[in-house]
Curated annotation (Swiss-Prot):
It holds the Pfam family Ubie_methyltran. Keywords: Menaquinone biosynthesis, Methyltransferase, S-adenosyl-L-methionine, Transferase, Ubiquinone biosynthesis. S-adenosyl-L-methionine binds at residues 74, 95, 123-124, 140. Belongs to the class I-like SAM-binding methyltransferase superfamily. MenG/UbiE family. It comes from Yersinia enterocolitica serotype O:8 / biotype 1B (strain NCTC 13174 / 8081). PANTHER family: 2-METHOXY-6-POLYPRENYL-1,4-BENZOQUINOL METHYLASE, MITOCHONDRIAL, METHYLTRANSFERASE. One of its GO terms (biological process) is aerobic respiration. One of its GO terms (molecular function) is 2-methoxy-6-polyprenyl-1,4-benzoquinol methyltransferase activity. Pathway: Quinol/quinone metabolism; menaquinone biosynthesis; menaquinol from 1,4-dihydroxy-2-naphthoate: step 2/2; Cofactor biosynthesis; ubiquinone biosynthesis. The gene is ubiE. Methyltransferase required for the conversion of demethylmenaquinol (DMKH2) to menaquinol (MKH2) and the conversion of 2-polyprenyl-6-methoxy-1,4-benzoquinol (DDMQH2) to 2-polyprenyl-3-methyl-6-methoxy-1,4-benzoquinol (DMQH2). The keyword Cell wall biogenesis/degradation does not apply. It catalyses: a 2-demethylmenaquinol + S-adenosyl-L-methionine = a menaquinol + S-adenosyl-L-homocysteine + H(+); a 2-methoxy-6-(all-trans-polyprenyl)benzene-1,4-diol + S-adenosyl-L-methionine = a 5-methoxy-2-methyl-3-(all-trans-polyprenyl)benzene-1,4-diol + S-adenosyl-L-homocysteine + H(+). This is Ubiquinone/menaquinone biosynthesis C-methyltransferase UbiE. InterPro entries: SAM-dependent_MTases_sf (IPR029063), UbiE/COQ5_MeTrFase (IPR004033), UbiE/COQ5_MeTrFase_CS (IPR023576).
């Protein structure tokens, strides 16, 4: 039984073999990539932009620094970081999903954001970067889709410079029971219908809702970050705990 648990993981509410999850998640994001930005605005009523703005404000990123926007998708954070680091800095937009990475590259180039941004297809569990390389790493709404989160956190710790910080922006556990019930009703009954109407894909958005429920809560993720080596780990609850921003440092 213990051996079986070591070889399985969650895909939404389903239990699947670990080697299957990466491909299953890939199919979800191949499917949603083209409508990803539109669906983000619809699903969150545009509030995701405020959550991301808060993340940027907490990053402490300065001119000349090197930033990794991990699971960066369509590049919302990368666009902001590109301006902050300036010509002497560098932003790496990394994503495991080719379709999402392509959408991000096309969107940023259309905006004229070139020169200090590079694009890398990478698995968070085995980042292809040198030790002590980045001043700041962000992973926004991506960690819950990673098969082995502890391994990914250790990989992020390795490539972060001493003195650098990791910011994890992710859906979490609402603080109040009435909010939690309303959020569940929205996520499981309304969200898949929006996905069907706008993206002709209810199943992918049902998975996204389920993956949120299976993600570690605020205190559990804090402990996971500390176990990976991060220090001074704190978190801020946003929108009543629907989302949390975790921050940790490497010293």
């Amino acid at each position: 039984m213990v051996d079986q648990e070591k070889e399985t993981t969650h895909f939404g509410f389903r239990t699947v073999a670990k080697e299957q999850k990466e491909g299953m998640v890939a199919e979800v994001f191949h499917s949603v990539a083209a409508k990803y930005d539109l669906m983000n605005d619809l699903m969150s009523f545009g509030v995701h932009r405020i959550w991301k703005r808060f993340t940027i404000d907490c990053s402490g990123v300065r001119r000349g620094q090197r930033v990794l926007d991990l699971a960066g998708g369509t590049g919302d954070l990368t666009a902001k970081f590109s301006r902050l680091v300036g010509e002497q800095g560098e932003v790496v937009l990394a994503d495991i999903n080719e379709s999402m990475l392509r959408m991000g590259r096309e969107k940023l180039r259309d905006k004229g954001i070139v020169g200090n941004v590079s694009y890398v297809q990478a698995n968070a569990e085995a980042l292809p970067f040198p030790d002590n390389y980045f001043d700041c790493i962000t992973i926004s709404f991506g960690l819950r889709n990673v098969t082995e989160k502890e391994k990914a956190l250790r990989s992020m710790f390795r490539v972060l410079k001493p003195g650098g910080r990791l910011l994890v922006l992710e859906f979490s556990k609402p603080l109040l029971e009435p909010l939690s019930k309303a959020y569940d009703a929205y996520s499981f009954h309304i969200l898949p219908k929006i996905g069907e109407l706008v993206a002709q894909d209810s199943e992918s958005y049902r998975y996204l809702a389920e993956s949120i429920r299976m993600h570690p809560d605020q205190e559990t993720l804090k402990s996971m970050m500390m176990d990976a080596g991060f220090e001074n780990v704190t978190y801020s609850n946003l929108t009543g705990g629907i989302v949390a921003l975790h921050r940790g440092f490497k010293f």
